[in-house]
């Protein structure tokens, strides 16, 4: 489902969707796009579509999200941590970090008496 005419204040534009839903809206420049992306309580994934890798990296550095895709949103590299921020949650899945999050590592602080 593509929401191309949804208001900026609507749920589809402000809340996390874990289904086949995308909200699209025009912006005047990258600064406005970044401000709108960051104006949310969620931050799981962003997908940037551009031919300019340097521009994508510059935007990715400024958006508050745990995972950033460029020209895709269909793949998770098992070697990289998949993580979110804000109300999306903390911690991560996949990678060594995800393994440790799921297996509950334990710290030992031992001192000989």
Q: Where are the language model's segments positioned?
A:
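Conserved C-terminal structural/oligomerization subdomain of aldehyde/semialdehyde dehydrogenase
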Residues: 1-113
């Amino acid at each position: 489902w593509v929401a191309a005419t949804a208001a900026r204040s609507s749920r589809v534009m402000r809340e996390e969707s874990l289904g086949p839903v995308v909200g699209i809206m025009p912006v005047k420049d990258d600064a406005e796009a970044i401000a709108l992306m960051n104006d949310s309580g969620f931050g799981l994934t962003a997908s940037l579509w551009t031919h300019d890798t340097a521009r994508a990296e510059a935007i990715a550095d400024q958006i508050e999200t745990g995972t950033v895709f460029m020209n895709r949103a269909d793949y998770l590299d098992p070697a990289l941590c998949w993580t979110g921020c804000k109300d999306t949650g903390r911690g991560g899945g996949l990678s060594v970090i995800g393994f440790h999050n799921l297996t509950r590592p334990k710290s030992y602080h031992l001192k000989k008496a």
